Amino acid sequence: TVSCGQVDTALTPCLTYLTKGGTPSTQCCSGVRSLKSMTGTKVPDRQAACNCLKQAAARYQGIKDAAAALSQKCGVQLSVPISRSTDCSKIS
């Protein structure tokens, strides 16, 4: 399954965008694509990544609603939302 270390590593380049807004960097969008490939086809992987994203969002109080738009801004369709309030058990 996906580990929080993998998720954190993928999205670390996005911290500036997530806390300050603007446009995500190329490295950030590469990380989003990497996250997409990690969470591809298996429900347990998607749920694990969801829980990691939820924990990460809670750690960084400055994260704006920009997190929800991150995958869209990078042109990547993620199967896992980046949010503090997602019920990860409902992800299929």
UniProtKB/Swiss-Prot annotation:
One GO term of the biological process aspect: lipid transport
UniProt superkingdom: Eukaryota
Record-level Gene Ontology MF annotations: lipid binding
Tissue note: Expressed in seeds and, at very low levels, in pulp of fruit (at protein level).
Keyword Disulfide bond among record annotations: yes
Disulfide cysteine pairs (residue numbers): C4-C52, C14-C28, C29-C74, C50-C88
This protein's record includes keyword Transport: yes
Coiled coil (residue ranges): none
Cross-referenced InterPro entries: Bifun_inhib/LTP/seed_sf (IPR036312), Bifunc_inhib/LTP/seed_store (IPR016140), Plant_nsLTP (IPR000528)
Keywords on record: Allergen, Disulfide bond, Lipid-binding, Transport
Protein's job: Plant non-specific lipid-transfer proteins transfer phospholipids as well as galactolipids across membranes. May play a role in wax or cutin deposition in the cell walls of expanding epidermal cells and certain secretory tissues.
Family: Belongs to the plant LTP family.
Protein name: Non-specific lipid-transfer protein 2
